[in-house]
């Protein structure tokens, strides 16, 4: 697929069948138990959401928001309806960022690691701050303990008068860009902090565990004189902590059996992953898992999945070395405490991401799906492992009854860039949950475990592809009455059309079963920016957005994907744009039943300074062009930053044109700012020259469907129901939604 075949129907089966065989083999091991998860809430928060923890009763979530220096609290008494509670400022003298939070076993206290603006030139020690959260609506500070420079993750061991915190003191010596200094002058360490006095005991004080000598003695350790502890997980049964030393490509095991004195047991190398012919190392707008590499695992998160067995999230954080060894393993690994690999995911996680539209080609040359998080919990009495991808915005769920043979249960979409994971397994009402904290968009996702299998959701079926089809960035939608068809935008190099088979939508699933590559008449690949598509009897019209006004095009292709005609706006209409060098964009196209008339949505009209989009009508037989103006709503908070535009147009048999109007809120614009995601109708007959159209609300996606995705971009009516899909920018949650009758 890197140099796509010019044959019009591209299944890629021949190119990728071998690469996907391990996914199929893994999938065949999933039928031993029926339990699975379903998303019950996607909750926007104010600011970012990074590390998340849950109270033991499973009724309250606490998450860190570093940019604001706060803890956020959310009431999840009813998981499907989270309620935001007042935030808590954790800064000291107005300075500091929370990097981690853990909840005591009785749920009384939140223990927070706070980094104090240390950097390459300022060695400021951090704090462990304790807050009383007995009443989550009235959180009270309790005590502060000074720890080392740059605390990162922490975890708790013991309870009551034996309670201690194990803190990863990273001291990454950040430079002006915020990047860690590798091989720095200030070695990190592991601090063990006594918290016994919270329950009337005598604190064991601060014990610092140095790592330099152990790393120097470890073959293959990277930057051994600069330990950088990252993440902590505790095996409560064996009283042992595993701490990832990410940049050092190692983990440390800490013995916590003595109630007042911790001991370094050993440091283990996390070694390398070797991928042969099943990775994508090129950022080229094509997804082809055909390359090879060797990568240092460089684990970020770690989690105990069974006594004596822990998982590593092989994110990678360094650079390619002189031998060509890359940072990151692009998957996860299970190790035992001897340092032996119990299980290695290899290519399976990335192959799974490709099939579900979550593979981030823009990260191919770096770290691929960038697995950052792992968490473990017992659901339905069975051990499970959760594996999250920061760049792909998904979680894989595995059963680990046998750590040597994890069983893939499912892949679930998350909000943009999941950073933290938490499990809830002991609620009084029996509900078991897991939660993701999604940093970039500022949201929490809640998923509920169903012991007999999650019920099908035909309103929001999961979209998957046949083996060998890479997909994403769906920017336009149409139908032939039997199938849906979608185009991706220029996230892919060669333009293409996907066919979506809706036969299984009642079972909560739709399948991309065919992809047609678009070519010029001479056989050369067509490389444009498709933003809309309309089905006609002898093929499709594609609306391509140009980088300038003159670059906007309507492109006719036949059923084989070969270009038949390319049409630009007439010069008289182009002259109406306030700035011809700035395209406000073709964003959708609709065709009349006879194919004689096209309607085109121009995202932001002719003048960016005016809150108006435009509709252009082209009567093909007479070559007559007509323009009308469409009034846009305005964002209530910041109309400039969260500008409004049209992203799709659909013509109904009753003569109404449906327009999908949206703001820039959601995604990188933060979920809490997703305000306008609406479908309006206008009468097609009213599209006359110079008219200002009157719009009528048909669907409010934000209000009625909690639609927090930024780019709601595709819309089509199939079997009487109006379907909407978002552009995931190439990787992430593709939300295909049946909104009902238009």
Where are these regions (language model features)?
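Gram-negative bacterial Sec-dependent N-terminal signal peptides
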Residues: 2-26
């Amino acid at each position: 697929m890197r140099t796509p075949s010019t044959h019009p129907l591209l299944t890629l089966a021949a190119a990728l069948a071998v690469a996907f065989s391990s996914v199929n083999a893994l999938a065949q091991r999933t039928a031993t138990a029926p339990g699975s998860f379903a998303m019950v809430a996607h909750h926007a928060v104010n600011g970012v959401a990074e590390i998340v923890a849950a109270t033991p009763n499973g009724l309250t979530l606490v998450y860190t928001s570093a940019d604001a220096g706060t803890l956020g609290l959310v009431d999840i008494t009813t998981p499907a309806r989270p309620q935001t509670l007042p935030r808590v400022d954790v800064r000291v003298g107005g300075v500091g960022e929370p990097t981690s939070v853990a909840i005591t076993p009785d749920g009384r206290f939140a223990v927070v690691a706070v980094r104090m603006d240390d950097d390459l030139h300022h060695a400021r020690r951090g704090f462990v701050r304790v807050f009383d959260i007995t009443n989550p609506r009235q959180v009270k500070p309790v005590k502060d303990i000074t720890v080392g420079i740059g605390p990162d993750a922490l975890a708790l061991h013991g309870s009551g008068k034996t309670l201690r915190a194990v803190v990863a003191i990273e001291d990454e010596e950040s430079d002006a860009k915020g990047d860690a200094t590798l091989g720095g002058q200030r070695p990190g360490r592991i601090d063990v902090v006594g918290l016994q006095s919270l329950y009337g005991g005598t604190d064991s004080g601060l014990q610092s565990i140095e790592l330099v000598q152990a790393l120097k003695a470890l073959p293959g350790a990277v930057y051994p004189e600069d330990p950088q502890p990252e993440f902590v997980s505790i095996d409560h049964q064996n009283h042992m902590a595993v701490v990832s030393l990410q940049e050092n490509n190692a983990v440390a095991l800490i013995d916590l059996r003595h109630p007042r004195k911790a001991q370094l047991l050993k440091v283990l190398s996390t070694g390398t992953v070797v991928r042969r012919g099943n990775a994508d190392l090129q950022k080229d707008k094509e997804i082809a898992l055909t390359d090879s590499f060797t990568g240092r695992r460089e684990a970020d998160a770690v989690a105990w999945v069974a006594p004596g067995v822990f998982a590593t999230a092989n994110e990678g954080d360094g650079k390619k070395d002189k031998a060509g060894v890359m940072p990151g393993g692009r998957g996860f690994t299970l190790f035992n405490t001897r340092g032996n690999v119990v299980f290695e995911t290899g290519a399976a996680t990335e192959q799974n991401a490709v099939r579900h539209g979550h593979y981030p080609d823009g990260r191919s040359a770096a770290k691929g799906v960038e697995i950052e998080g792992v968490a473990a919990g017992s659901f339905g009495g069975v051990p499970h492992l959760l594996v999250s991808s920061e760049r792909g915005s998904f979680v894989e769920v595995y059963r680990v009854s046998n750590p040597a043979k994890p069983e893939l249960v499912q892949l679930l979409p998350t909000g943009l860039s999941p950073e933290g994971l938490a499990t809830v397994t002991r609620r009084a009402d029996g509900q078991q949950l897991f939660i993701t904290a999604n940093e970039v968009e500022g949201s929490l996702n809640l998923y509920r475990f169903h012991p007999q299998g999650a019920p099908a959701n035909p309103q929001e079926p999961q979209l998957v592809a046949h083996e060998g089809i890479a997909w994403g960035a769906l920017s336009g939608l149409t139908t032939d009455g039997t199938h849906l068809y979608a185009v991706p935008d220029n996230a892919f190099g060669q333009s293409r059309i996907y066919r979506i088979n809706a036969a299984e939508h009642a079972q909560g699933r739709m399948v991309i079963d065919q992809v047609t590559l678009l070519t010029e008449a001479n056989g050369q690949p067509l490389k444009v920016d498709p933003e809309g598509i309309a089905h006609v009897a002898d093929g499709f019209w594609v609306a391509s957005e140009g980088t300038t006004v003159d670059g906007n095009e309507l492109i006719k292709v036949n059923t084989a994907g070969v270009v038949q005609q390319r049409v630009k706006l007439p010069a008289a209409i182009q002259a109406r744009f306030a700035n011809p060098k700035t395209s406000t964009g073709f964003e959708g196209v609709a065709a009349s039943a006879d194919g004689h008339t096209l309607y085109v949505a121009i995202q932001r009209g002719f003048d960016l300074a005016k809150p108006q989009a435009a509709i252009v009508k082209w009567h093909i037989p007479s070559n007559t062009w007509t323009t009308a103006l469409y009034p846009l709503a305005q964002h209530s908070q910041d109309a400039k930053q969260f500008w409004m535009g049209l992203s799709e147009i659909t013509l109904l048999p009753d003569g109404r044109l449906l327009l999908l109007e949206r703001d820039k809120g959601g995604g990188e614009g933060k979920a809490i700012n997703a305000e306008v995601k609406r479908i309006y109708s206008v009468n097609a007959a009213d599209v006359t020259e110079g008219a200002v159209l009157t719009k009528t609300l048909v669907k409010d996606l934000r209000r009625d469907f909690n639609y927090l995705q930024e780019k709601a971009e595709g819309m089509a009516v199939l079997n009487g129901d109006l379907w909407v899909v978002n552009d995931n920018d190439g990787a992430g949650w593709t939300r295909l939604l049946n909104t009902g009758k238009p």
